[in-house]
From Swiss-Prot:
This is UPF0153 protein PA1578.1. It holds the Pfam family CxxCxxCC. Disulfide bonds: none annotated. InterPro entries: Puta_zinc/iron-chelating_dom (IPR005358), UPF0153_domain (IPR052572). Belongs to the UPF0153 family.
Length: 84
């Protein structure tokens, strides 16, 4: 599966424990990454300072669903399940 252009759910819904430029403590779940632009594209994509965890994430129908809204909901659900 290819990422949907303009989605950005993986840059909003999950927590990221790794430090990011401008977010040294990482990113809490449900908080928009500082590097997500107005078109929901990653400003760090392809740059060496992009966290490895972001580069390792791959689009998957079970996580991304059929729409941006579904992806946000599914990733938020995974956050709850994996936080327990």
């Amino acid at each position: 599966m290819q990422c949907r252009a303009g989605c950005g759910a993986c840059c909003i819904a999950p927590s990221i424990s790794s430090p990011l430029p401008g977010m040294p403590a990482g990113k809490p779940a449900g908080v928009r990454c500082l590097h997500l632009d107005e078109n929901h594209l990653c400003g760090l994509f392809g740059r060496p300072e992009r966290p490895a965890v972001c580069g390792q994430f791959g689009a998957d129908p079970e996580i991304c669903g059929d729409s941006r809204e579904q992806a946000l909901a599914l990733i938020a659900e995974w956050e709850v399940i994996t936080a327990a």
